[in-house]
């Protein structure tokens, strides 16, 4: 894995991430005009970065945030649809793969249910090869219907890719799920705003380290009249070190080459920091020295995860016992979310 050149090789996947300025749009026509702008950017980037195999745009980059619910429902897209047709044509022309945001994608029961927050991975032939729906929307603000699974797709030069979105990335479980399914590159598209800049930079680096995987983050920049977005799109190596990171500038681009062979060699041969292997071979040195086998312990020692899988309702009740029972809070109501008349007070 390396940074600083504009090339790539048979062993390296050239990945670019974009600090796309958050648009403020209201109509389908405006959305399609913006999609064409993104398509033109892709074709220009390929001229400057001839090794680019994959380009990643942030969450909300195509449609912006529709703060008006009627506009959100009216502009909700189908997949495939007009927006993806524009992106597919650009990927074919530029001979590159791309990750694009659709906020939102129409629910199967549209317009009776809220849309999904969706990413698509499109290959260099213009085919949609992965569609991921955000599993953990940013409540209480985001009103998206949650998705229910992650995916892994063989990407350019055989690199295995998973997609996650923004607030998903605050939960270590989703990173681990992608990595344990075989993901070598986890792409996190986000429309993250201040104040949580340092936390998000730290989270991406920590999850690359913890999951022995590459991470590509594309984040929005600018101000949309409601939120200010901090950019810092970045590409991170599987050892948790940043290869390249934008600042807060609008339309900043970072680029790095991610080696396919290096990550596979590390996962096969690293020992003390091979977190994926060691999690399912716990204590193998001591177990071997004790004459109890050569594989360590595979059983899950974490009661929370066992409860969640076997009895999700019980797990929910357990977390409510230490937090609260309603989704809203009386001291800072948001929208029409329900809340009790009084929350726990400090020390209660």
UniProtKB/Swiss-Prot annotation:
Occurrences of domain CN hydrolase (ranges): 13-260
Alphabetized Pfam families for the sequence: CN_hydrolase (PF00795)
UniProt cross-references to InterPro entries, sorted A to Z: Aliph_Amidase/BUP, Aliphatic_amidase, C-N_Hydrolase, C-N_Hydrolase_sf
EC number: 3.5.1.4
Top EC group: hydrolase
Gene3D superfamilies: Carbon-nitrogen hydrolase (3.60.110.10)
Active site as annotated: 59, 134, 166
Record field: catalytic activity: a monocarboxylic acid amide + H2O = a monocarboxylate + NH4(+)
GO molecular function, one term: amidase activity
Keywords, ordered alphabetically: Hydrolase
Function, in words: Catalyzes the hydrolysis of short-chain aliphatic amides to their corresponding organic acids with release of ammonia. Also exhibits in vitro acyl transferase activity, transferring the acyl moiety of short-chain amides to hydroxylamine to form hydroxamates.
HAMAP family: Aliphatic_amidase
Family membership noted in the UniProt record: Belongs to the carbon-nitrogen hydrolase superfamily. Aliphatic amidase family.
Record-given protein name: Aliphatic amidase
Gene: amiE
């Amino acid at each position: 894995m390396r940074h600083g050149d504009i090339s790539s090789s048979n062993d390296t996947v050239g990945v670019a991430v974009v600090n796309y300025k958050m648009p403020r749009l209201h109509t389908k026509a405006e959305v399609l005009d913006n999609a064409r702008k993104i398509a033109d950017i892709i074709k220009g980037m390929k001229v400057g970065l001839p090794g680019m195999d994959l380009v990643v745009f942030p969450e909300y980059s195509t449609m912006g945030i529709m703060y008006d619910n009627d506009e959100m429902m009216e502009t909700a897209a189908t997949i495939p649809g007009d927006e993806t047709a524009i992106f597919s044509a650009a990927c074919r022309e530029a001979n590159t793969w791309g990750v694009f945001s659709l906020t939102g994608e129409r629910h199967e029961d549209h317009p009776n249910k809220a849309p999904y927050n969706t990413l698509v991975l499109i290959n260099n032939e213009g085919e949609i090869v992965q569609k991921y729906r955000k599993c953990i929307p940013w409540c209480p603000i985001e009103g998206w219907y949650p998705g229910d699974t992650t995916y892994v797709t063989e990407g350019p030069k055989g690199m295995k890719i998973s997609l996650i979105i923004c607030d998903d990335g605050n939960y270590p479980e989703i990173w681990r799920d992608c990595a344990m399914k075989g993901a070598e590159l986890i792409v996190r598209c986000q429309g993250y705003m201040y104040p949580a800049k340092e936390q998000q930079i730290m989270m991406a680096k920590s999850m690359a380290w913890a999951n022995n995987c590459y991470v590509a983050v594309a984040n929005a920049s600018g101000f949309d009249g409601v939120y200010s977005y901090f950019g810092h799109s970045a590409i991170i190596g599987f050892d948790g070190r940043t290869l390249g990171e934008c600042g807060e500038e609008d339309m900043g681009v970072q680029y790095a080459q991610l080696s396919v062979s290096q990550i596979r060699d590390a996962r096969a041969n690293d020992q003390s920091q091979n977190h994926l292997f060691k999690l399912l071979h716990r204590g193998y040195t001591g177990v071997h020295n004790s004459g109890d086998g050569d594989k360590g312990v595979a059983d899950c020692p974490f009661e929370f995860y066992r409860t969640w899988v076997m009895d999700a309702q019980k797990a929910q009740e357990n977390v409510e016992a230490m937090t609260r029972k309603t989704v809203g809070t009386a001291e800072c109501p948001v929208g029409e979310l329900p809340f009790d008349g009084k929350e726990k007070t400090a020390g209660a």
